[in-house]
Amino acid sequence: MALLQIAEPGQSPQPHQRRLAVGIDLGTTNSLVATLRSGLAESLKDTEGETILPSAVRYLPDGRVEVGRAAKAAAAVDPLNTVLSVKRLMGRGIADVKLLGEQLPYRFAEGESHMPFIETVQGPKSPVEVSAEILRVLRRRAEEALGGELVGAVITVPAYFDEAQRQATKDAARLAGLDVLRLLNEPTAAAVAYGLDRGAEGVVAIYDLGGGTFDISILRLTRGVFEVLATGGDSALGGDDFDHAIANWIVEQAGLSADLDPGVQRHLLQLACAAKEALSDSGSVALAYGPWQGELSRERFEALIEPLVARSLKACRRALRDAGIEPQEIAAVVMVGGSTRVPRVRRAAAELFDRQPLTDIDPDQVVAIGAALQADTLAGNGRDGEELLLLDVNPLSLGLETMGRLMEKVIPRNTTLPVARAQEFTTYKDGQTAMLIHVLQGERELVKDCRSLARFELRGIPPMVAGAAKIRVTFQVDADGLLNVSARELGSGIEASVQVKPSYGLTDGEIARMLKDSFEYAGGDKAARALREQQVEAQRLLEAVQAALEADGEALLSPAERAAIEAQMQALRGVLDGPDAAVIETHVRHLTQVTDAFAARRLDASVKAALSGRRLNEIEE
């Protein structure tokens, strides 16, 4: 919905002038910028007539920065100063990046908060700075083509990008001088590009295989409303991996050493990429590297990439299961990303969903076009009846740590965004005046199996008995998937909050691993959670009974009664660290039974003390 525009006194609001906004597909391999002109979405071309900008940045000794084709062409001769596929590094930590070492021929330095910096002749550069160079070129291209300054841009991101990766994308845009109208999930943008919002109803699958990431989204379309039923994918699967599969095959066939210098790696990857593209139209391609010559057939290529294609299909099946949808219920399959030009990929999607996928729009441009349509609406240019409602979801559950190091989910995964959820918690010990809020992301039951996002403290809680204080913790996730968490003690009104901005993102495949583990270990996790909960309950009971004995044991219990209680306490302590929740529960019940009479006497004594010295009419009043 457009904001109301109020003109300055004496000035015309000029309603006929369109506000200039663009959609940007910031891709792993290539990037594009698109806009709406005369009611039609189009990708904007550079001065050489090219729409695609290779996502390549080269830093030169004289201080200049090359972006695009020139940088990509120099990758083999200047690999250490030429950054490709920087999207893989966005929002990641230095430890995550080292896991990709063999695929990334750069020299890395560790910055603040474990941020990875790429060493170049112009000094260390962060992934955010590199991405900003790409966005800066796209912004200039758009402003030159449109003849004015942009009011903002919709930038697309993989549906599986977590908070750190999304925030890194926003930071890069800010460095490039762009106002981000919204971050839009790439699969959702593709659905917009195909016009599926106009009158179409049903369930659609968006199969998005780009250069470095794979996303599958299951969307329900109802009267122009997009609802994402489920998302899935792999944050480290794409066309780059196809290139590496071919390059490794060449190394093996040519008898090359596995320890190759960066320049050779770059050259082999360029050779592999050209072969991959040729095999989309030809049955075989001739290859040569140094003295070695060979031929790669399409059949052999498909065998090399079959494990990668299978990974994408596995994610598709998981997303269908999450959405509660059978493959035959899918009304349309939209193919997105340059890697979907590979015939084996198209066949695999057709076989899984039992229908031919939609490939009418250039798969390299479809995401940028969808983003441009959404940007035009958000900029206030939408015509009556053409507003678009996009409901995205969070890819993993969000929650916090409770006693016993348990994960309490506050916002389950696949919850429609934006969303705000609140849950009330209480103190564990008498007189507790502070609470540590530990924010987590993941699907498992125990804290150790989930990812830590942030920690903050709520201080100044009025001292009271355990369980009396009420602390409301509110999770808010905006339309871009960014999280804010606040905690408020309801009695005193004290409050603390944190914007979750972790310094790096998930490791390769970590989201997929989290989901996989949540299914595989569901039974064991529930048993472990039950054990922890029983241990927490037992510990709480032991502390309460011990405090009661110290306060009133001598006055209200006979020596035999006290001995019986202490014996049962000792028995409970003996099984407290054991593996059987049922055994602990039995001992808790026994201790409760043996202390029932003691609890009743303490209550009577408290009532007598409260009424002592008061007249009947005072009590009645």
From Swiss-Prot:
The keyword Protease does not apply. GO terms for molecular function: ATP binding; ATP hydrolysis activity; ATP-dependent protein folding chaperone; unfolded protein binding. InterPro entries: ATPase_NBD, Heat_shock_70_CS, HscA_NBD, HSP70_C_sf, HSP70_peptide-bd_sf, Hsp_70_fam, ISC_FeS_clus_asmbl_HscA. The keyword ATP-binding applies. Keywords: ATP-binding, Chaperone, Nucleotide-binding. It holds the Pfam family HSP70. GO terms for biological process: iron-sulfur cluster assembly. NCBIfam families: HscA, PRK05183.1. Chaperone involved in the maturation of iron-sulfur cluster-containing proteins. Has a low intrinsic ATPase activity which is markedly stimulated by HscB. Belongs to the heat shock protein 70 family. This is Chaperone protein HscA homolog.
